[in-house]
C-alpha cells in the first residue's frame, strides 16, 4: 500500500487506518460522529494527499482541456477553479475533476485517487498539439481544512491578501514553506473550507503549521469516514458510487457542468445521441433502518434500481441515500430492500444538507 507524507504523524495521533484506493488512509480518529459534527459546527483537518494531480501545459493546453472536459474553460480566469466531468467516447464518466487555471497555458487537474493511472493514460492519449501532460501526484501533498471556523484557522497562517475570497478560487503563496503552496477555497464537505497543496518534502512542516494554528479553535483531525458522511449530506457524487465508466453522464444530475453548446468534446456525440434511461435521486427512509450501497430499490413490486450511497445522517438524524433508478418511474411507493426487509422511502430534494451562508 502507498502512504501519504502524513501517515506516520496521523498514526501517532491515533488514526485508525484502512486501505483506500491503494493508500493507507485514516478512516477515523475520535469517531466519525465527532468528526462530522466538528466540520459542520467548527473545523476539521483532513489528509487528502491520496488525490491525484496532473499538470497540462503549453500553447495547446486550453484546447486540450476543452476537448477532454465537459465544462467550458474558455471563460476560466487565472486563479479560478472549475468542476467538470471527463468522458469516454460512449458518454461514460472516466472521472470527475477540478481544473485550476494557473495561466492560459498552464492548468492543474485534481483527479480521484483510484483513477490517477487511468486518467493520466486517457489524458495523454487525447492531447492536442503543443500540450504536455505531467503526473505530479507523487510529489504533491494536500491538506483540507473544512468548516465554519476554517477561515479563522487560515487567517492565523496566511496574510489576508493571500486568502482567496470566493469559492472555487485559489492563490499561490510564497514564503510559508521552501516552495510555493496553493491555497484553494474548495472542499468536499458542503461547508466553507480550504485545500492546501504543497510539495511532499514540505508536507510535514505544513501539517505542523496548520495543526498549531487550529489548536485555538479545537480543530478536529478527521478521517475518510466523516468525509464520506459529509459529502453524502451535500449530495456530492463519489466516483465508483454515483458514477463510473459505464454511467451515462446525463443520468447523474450534473448537467449544469456539461456544456453541450460548446464545440466538440469527447463524449458529446454520445450524449446527444443517447436519451437518459436512469436518474439519480435522493431518498429518506420512512421505516427504521439504513439503506446501504447496492441495496435494491423498488417502485411498488418492480425492481427499479439500487442505492449508490447511504448512511444515517449525523446532521439530520435521518437515514438518507442517493439512488440510481429508472427514469420516469412512479416514486409514490418506493421501498429499499435492507437484509430482506422492504423499508419504505420517500424522494427528497438534493442536497440533503445546505449550509446557511
Task: Specify the residue positions occupied by each region the protein language model found.
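A subset of signal/propeptide-processing and intrinsically disordered low-complexity segments
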Residues: 42, 90-91, 223, 228
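Short coil/turn segments at secondary-structure boundaries
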Residues: 52, 56, 89, 94, ...
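Glycine-rich, Trp-frequent "lid" loop and neighboring beta-strands that shape
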Residues: 98-99
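Acidic, proline/glycine-enriched N-terminal capping motif
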Residues: 1-84, 92
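Internal amphipathic helical hairpin motif
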Residues: 59-93, 151-179
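Conserved, structured C-terminal
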Residues: 1-21, 25-29, 102-357
Amino acid at each position: 500500500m502507498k502512504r501519504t507524507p502524513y501517515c506516520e504523524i496521523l498514526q501517532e495521533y491515533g488514526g485508525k487506518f484502512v486501505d483506500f484506493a491503494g493508500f493507507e488512509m485514516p478512516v477515523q480518529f475520535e469517531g466519525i460522529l465527532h468528526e462530522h459534527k466538528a466540520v459542520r459546527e467548527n473545523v476539521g483537518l483532513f489528509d487528502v494527499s491520496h488525490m491525484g494531480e496532473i499538470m497540462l501545459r503549453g500553447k495547446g493546453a486550453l484546447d486540450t482541456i476543452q476537448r477532454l472536459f465537459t465544462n467550458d474553460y474558455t471563460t476560466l480566469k487565472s486563479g479560478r477553479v472549475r468542476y467538470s466531468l471527463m468522458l469516454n467516447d460512449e458518454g461514460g464518466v472516466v472521472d470527475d475533476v477540478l481544473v485550476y487555471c494557473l495561466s492560459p497555458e498552464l492548468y492543474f487537474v485534481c483527479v480521484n485517487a483510484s483513477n490517477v493511472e487511468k486518467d493520466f493514460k486517457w489524458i495523454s492519449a487525447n492531447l492536442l498539439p503543443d500540450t504536455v501532460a505531467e503526473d505530479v501526484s507523487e510529489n504533491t501533498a494536500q491538506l483540507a481544512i473544512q468548516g465554519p471556523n476554517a477561515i479563522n484557522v487560515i487567517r492565523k497562517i496566511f496574510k489576508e491578501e493571500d486568502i482567496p475570497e470566493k469559492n472555487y478560487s485559489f492563490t499561490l503563496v510564497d514564503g510559508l514553506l521552501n516552495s510555493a503552496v496553493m491555497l484553494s477555497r474548495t472542499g468536499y464537505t458542503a461547508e466553507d473550507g480550504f485545500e492546501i497543496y504543497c510539495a511532499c518534502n514540505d508536507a510535514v512542516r505544513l501539517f505542523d503549521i496548520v495543526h498549531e494554528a487550529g489548536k485555538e479553535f479545537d480543530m478536529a483531525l478527521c478521517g475518510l469516514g466523516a468525509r464520506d458522511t459529509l459529502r453524502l449530506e451535500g449530495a456530492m457524487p463519489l466516483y465508483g458510487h454515483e458514477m463510473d465508466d459505464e454511467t451515462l453522464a446525463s443520468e447523474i444530475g450534473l448537467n449544469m457542468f456539461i456544456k453541450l453548446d460548446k464545440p466538440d468534446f469527447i463524449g458529446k456525440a454520445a450524449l446527444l445521441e443517447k436519451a437518459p434511461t436512469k436518474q439519480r435521486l435522493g431518498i429518506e427512509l420512512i421505516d427504521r433502518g439504513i439503506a446501504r450501497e447496492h441495496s435494491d430499490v423498488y417502485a411498488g413490486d418492480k425492481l427499479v434500481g439500487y442505492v449508490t450511497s447511504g448512511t444515517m445522517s449525523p446532521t439530520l438524524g435521518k437515514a438518507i441515500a442517493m439512488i440510481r433508478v429508472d427514469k420516469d418511474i412512479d416514486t409514490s411507493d418506493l421501498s429499499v430492500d435492507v437484509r430482506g426487509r422492504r423499508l419504505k422511502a420517500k424522494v427528497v430534494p438534493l442536497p440533503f444538507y445546505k449550509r446557511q451562508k
